[in-house]
């Protein structure tokens, strides 16, 4: 978000842009993640490779990322007997960019920084513990809260988790989920149920909420 930028046109490749007449104050498009959001598929490490190239030229500020990942670190310690979950949590930690700030190239006399912040809450829907933990690790890696259906599976799992993790989990009855506040959705399960969930999410008023749908056991979640 730019405030009071005395600019009527953005320089392509240097400054983010806001559309016709919107290059001053207001929300912006552009930046290192822009093109990736237009792709239907991509390598899982694509974002990390892009940022690594930039970080080699300019130092990265990751102080906030360290704080955001404390619940994820607690999950990793809890998963001492689950090597696959530990490895996946570490992978998500390395891929997640929430809490990072980078100085972007720009014209003399102007300072442009890119700061990536987490959304507030992510609805996670799964019908088995493995997928619920995959979703949990991904959401904690980016610093968000988890919204779980109030079911026996999720309640029992939450009781096993360390306090630092369970404090980041919220519950709602299944019939109340569409009316709850959440900013994104992660789903594991059958395609028919995914279609129904997408219809419910699309019928909500307000901002468009993205839904990531996966078959059971898949872990190639997009974290940005």
Question: What is the predicted function of each stretch?
Answer:
Residues 1-125, 129-131, 135-224:
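C-terminal segments
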């Amino acid at each position: 978000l730019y405030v009071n930028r005395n600019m009527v046109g953005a320089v392509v490749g240097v400054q983010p842009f806001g559309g016709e007449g919107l290059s001053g104050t207001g929300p912006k498009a552009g930046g290192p993640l822009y093109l990736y959001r237009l792709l239907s598929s991509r390598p899982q490490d694509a974002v990390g490779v892009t940022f690594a190239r930039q970080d080699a030229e300019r130092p990265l500020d990751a102080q906030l990322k360290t704080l955001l990942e404390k619940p994820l670190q607690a999950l990793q310690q809890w998963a001492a007997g689950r090597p696959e979950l530990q490895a996946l949590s570490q992978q998500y930690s390395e891929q997640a960019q929430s809490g990072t700030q980078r100085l972007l190239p720009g014209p003399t006399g102007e300072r442009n920084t890119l700061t990536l912040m987490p959304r507030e809450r992510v609805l996670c829907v799964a019908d088995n513990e493995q997928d619920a933990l995959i979703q949990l690790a991904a959401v904690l890696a980016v610093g968000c809260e988890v919204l779980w259906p109030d079911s026996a599976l999720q309640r029992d799992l939450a009781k096993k988790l360390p306090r630092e993790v369970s404090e980041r989990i919220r519950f709602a009855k299944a019939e109340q989920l569409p009316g709850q506040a959440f900013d994104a959705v992660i789903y594991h399960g059958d395609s028919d149920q995914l279609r129904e969930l997408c219809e419910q999410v699309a019928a909500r008023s307000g901002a468009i909420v993205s839904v990531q749908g996966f078959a059971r056991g898949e872990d190639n979640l997009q974290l940005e």
